[in-house]
Amino acid sequence: MGGGIFGTLHPFLEGGAVYGRKVANTGFMEALLRLDPFDEYHFFVTDPDALRTAFAARDTLPGAARGAVKIFSRQDLADALRATPYHCFHLSDPVSGQPELAALRNALAPRIFPITSVNHSISYLDYAQRFLAHIWPGVTVRDAIGATSRAASKVLAGYFAQLREGYSLNPAWLRPRLEIIPLGVDPEAFPEPTPEARRAARARFGLADGEAVCLLHGRISLDDKLDAM
């Protein structure tokens, strides 16, 4: 241990319909608690009981097994920021509370810790308004948004550049830096298929051995997820 205290405003472990964001967030949190680099993990969420139930099903993960996961109500956040020298806060996406948390940190925290997040969908119309809130004097050079691809990083940089120009923002105002952090694949959950398994899969779909196949990873929705079309 010895890595300080990790904080977040988001549960990362969510039920309901299966979306890519939820799968990625669950994978991140399970991997983090398996590696277990921090002394404690503080969650400030709107439904503490639901998150406690989710963690009860993962009590074999090292970070959870040793009791390092601490779950609080969002209402406890201000007092915790005043009293706790957090190592960092990491959020499950950049459009749900990152600028607001930075403002609270700057006002209350005894130590100015970095705040990070990672992008998921970036195509919704209201996202420009949400990203506008990221450009202000309270951002520090250690605050960051993880982009899951070079393309995502380019889009996010374009958002910020367009907002600066369109609103004539002060060039001295920072925005979170962009770091390209590709999504990982758990080799145990998705092992490389054997030649026999690959041939069987092709046969299942009536594909010849040398026939090219394009596999689309993602969710297809008529209203907001037809990028491939």
Locations of the language-model features?
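Extended catalytic core of nucleotide-activated donor transferases of GT-like folds
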Residues: 25, 48-138
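A short, active-site helix/loop in glycosyltransferases that binds the activated sugar's phosphate group
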Residues: 99, 129-200
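Short catalytic/ligand-binding loop motif for oxyanion handling, primarily in non-cytosolic enzymes
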Residues: 14, 50-54, 97-100, 125-127, ...
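Residues that mark the start of a beta-strand
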Residues: 1-5, 114, 211-213
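Short hydrophobic "strand-cap" motifs at the C-terminus of beta-strands
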Residues: 118, 148, 216-220
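Conserved catalytic-core segment of nucleotide-activated headgroup transferases in glycan assembly
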Residues: 186-229
